[in-house]
Amino acid sequence: MAGLGAAVLLAVGGCAGHQAAPAPAPARSTAASTPAPTATPLTAAELAWITAVTNLHHKVDKPFRASSMTMTRAKMTELGNALRACGRELRRMGAPGTRLQPVYVKVTKACQALDRGARCFAKAASVSDAVGGTVAGTVEARIQSRSLSCGFAAQGNGSNLLSGAEERAAAIKAQFA
C-alpha cells in the first residue's frame, strides 16, 4: 500500500516540482451574438454591366447569323470589324466590381479570341479582290482559305466564351438576388 500512496501523491502533486499546465478556458462562441452577414443585392451599375455583356454578345454575333453570305472583301472587312468591336466595347464598359470579376475575366478572354478572328478576316480581305476571289492554287488562295477558317473558328470560340460569361453572370445574379 505504501507504493499506492506514493503514486497518488505523484499524480496529485505532479513530478519533481513541476506544476501541471492550467486547463484551457472553454472557448466562447460568438455565433449566437453576431448575426450572419447577408449578401447585398447587385447594384444598378452591376446589373447594367451584365446587360451590356448580353448586348455586346448580340452585337458581335449579329453579322454571323445571316442565313447566307457572299464573302466579298467588304464582307470580310465587316466581319472583322464586328469582332474587333468586342475589345472596344469592353474598354468602354470598364471593369465591374469585385463580385463580377469572374465574368470580366471570361469576357476579356472572349474579346481576345474575337480580336484574333478580326485579324484573320483582315488577312483574308487583304489577299482577296473586290468580289472576294483569288486565283485557285495560288499562295493567296491558301492564305484566304486558312484565314477565313481561322476567323470563323475564332468567332465561334469567342461567342462560346461570351455565352459562358453570361451564364456566370446569371449565377452571380441569382446568388445576390
Model regions and ranges:
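C-terminal motif of bacterial Sec signal peptides marking the signal peptidase cleavage site
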Residues: 11-14
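Short, low-complexity, disordered segments immediately C-terminal to signal peptides
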Residues: 16-39
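Alpha-helical segments in soluble extracytoplasmic regions
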Residues: 39-123, 127-177
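Bacterial N-terminal signal peptides that target proteins for export
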Residues: 1-4
